[in-house]
């Protein structure tokens, strides 16, 4: 929930990250609100962020290069190993709804090296920023957190599977996709 997305399958149902409810309430309260809107003749649209993830369950050490904050196409360092928050296992959900676990290969960059405490944009070696994005900052694929790599077919499939699950469960009328220019 919000811009710091952790588990898109958790609508306030699982004990994760110190809470069950989201900041907006429980899964049942959310579904009841959608039903009430429909009964009042009001369409409902889910505000979704599929650009990045935050709050990983484990760290991974991977090769990356730093890129310039003002132009993400310019690499500013040699290849180095960075310890990054890219392993998402969702232990509180215990694979309910999806057994997909995210790892560094599902992302193309991140903004923090947990080993050194350095804040920088780290592009993962052998990864490319997305092509169909805003040209602000040279290439505005990277925004924050662990940036999803939509050139990875497994990422695309998981996002589509999640979308079908979400629509089937919530019966919302559609989505407002946030951060799509990234």
Language-model segment annotations:
Residues 22-23, 180-182:
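Acidic-and-aromatic substrate-binding clefts and catalytic sites of carbohydrate-active enzymes
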Residues 1-165, 169-170:
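Substrate-binding/active-site clefts of carbohydrate-active enzymes
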Residues 174-180:
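Short catalytic-loop micro-motif centered on adjacent basic/acidic residues
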């Amino acid at each position: 929930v919000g811009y710091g997305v952790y588990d898109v399958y958790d609508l306030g149902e699982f004990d994760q990250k110190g809470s069950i409810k989201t900041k907006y309430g429980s899964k049942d309260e959310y579904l009841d609100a959608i039903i009430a809107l429909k009964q009042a003749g009001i369409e409902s649209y889910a505000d979704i962020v599929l650009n990045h993830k935050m709050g990983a369950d484990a760290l991974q050490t991977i090769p990356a290069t730093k890129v310039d904050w003002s132009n993400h196409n310019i690499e500013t360092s040699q290849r180095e190993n960075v310890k990054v928050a890219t392993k998402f296992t969702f232990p509180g959900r215990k694979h309910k709804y999806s057994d997909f676990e995210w790892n560094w290969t599902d992302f193309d960059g991140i903004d923090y090296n947990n080993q050194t405490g350095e804040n920088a944009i780290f592009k993962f070696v052998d990864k490319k920023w997305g092509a169909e994005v805003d040209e602000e900052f040279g290439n505005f694929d990277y925004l924050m957190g662990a940036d999803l790599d939509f050139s990875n077919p497994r990422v695309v499939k998981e996002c589509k599977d999640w979308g079908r699950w979400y629509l089937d469960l919530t019966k919302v009328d559609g989505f407002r996709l946030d951060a799509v220019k990234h």
